[in-house]
């Protein structure tokens, strides 16, 4: 079920907590840094390379200067390889506040280089989407299903009625595991450490080594 992160605060006494919340969300939604961006594919993008621009920092999710727009019809298909394995726990999909916003996403794990024909298969999970121009609605994948993912495909088959689909931001929340010669490092982006400590270096203190 999707849920929102927006809150209605009544006074300036909440400003500090708002800042901390934004910093914390920025830390949690840092899996974009673990995407093998050079090998990301976006099928049916209007301009080559446009699709990569929607994977950006949480605090820049409302930057409307970078987006992807579909070309021949309303379909978009992202093939997203990671530099290690992820456990996917949350997705935010933000589009325009009009009918070009996608109305559905179908999610496939560990199926590299999917085509539109491949995307007709049954997905591992799908969500009916709500218009979200501010990037405040999170969709929660089944953690058991998406507990060991090295490649993610996101298929957007349709929108709310426009000829083309436009997406500004795709955010991914979860855990990242990378193999090293001397063990495995697990980076937990749900750590509730003091967000202010991460203002300059978002990953300090987030990982722990397992020998």
UniProtKB/Swiss-Prot annotation:
Transmembrane segments: none
Recorded superkingdom: Eukaryota
UniProt xrefs under Pfam families: PITH (PF06201)
Domain PITH residues, every copy: 20-192
InterPro entries on file: Galactose-bd-like_sf, PITH1-like, PITH_dom, PITH_dom_sf
GO cellular component terms, semicolon-separated: cytoplasm; nucleus
Family: Belongs to the PITHD1 family.
The protein's name: PITH domain-containing protein CG6153
Species for this entry: Drosophila melanogaster
Lineage: Eukaryota, Metazoa, Ecdysozoa, Arthropoda, Hexapoda
């Amino acid at each position: 079920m999707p849920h929102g992160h927006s809150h209605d605060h009544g006074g300036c006494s909440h400003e500090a907590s708002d800042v901390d919340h934004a910093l914390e969300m920025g830390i949690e939604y840092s899996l974009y840094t673990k995407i093998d961006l050079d090998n990301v594919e976006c099928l049916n993008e209007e301009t080559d390379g446009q699709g990569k621009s929607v994977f950006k920092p949480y605090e820049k999710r409302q930057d409307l200067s970078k987006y992807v727009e579909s070309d021949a019809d309303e379909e978009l298909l992202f093939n997203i390889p990671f530099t290690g394995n992820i456990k996917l726990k949350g997705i935010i999909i933000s589009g325009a506040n009009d009918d070009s916003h996608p109305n559905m996403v179908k999610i496939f794990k560990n199926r590299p280089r999917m085509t539109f024909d491949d995307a007709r298969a049954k997905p591992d999970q799908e969500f009916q989407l709500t218009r979200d121009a501010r990037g405040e609605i999170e969709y929660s994948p089944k953690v058991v299903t998406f507990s060991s993912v090295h490649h993610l495909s996101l298929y957007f088959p349709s929108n709310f009625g426009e000829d083309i689909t436009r997406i500004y931001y795709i955010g991914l929340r979860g855990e990242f595991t990378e193999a090293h010669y001397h063990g495995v490092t697990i980076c937990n982006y749900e750590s509730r450490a003091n967000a202010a400590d991460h203002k300059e270096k978002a990953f300090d203190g987030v990982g722990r080594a397992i020998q």
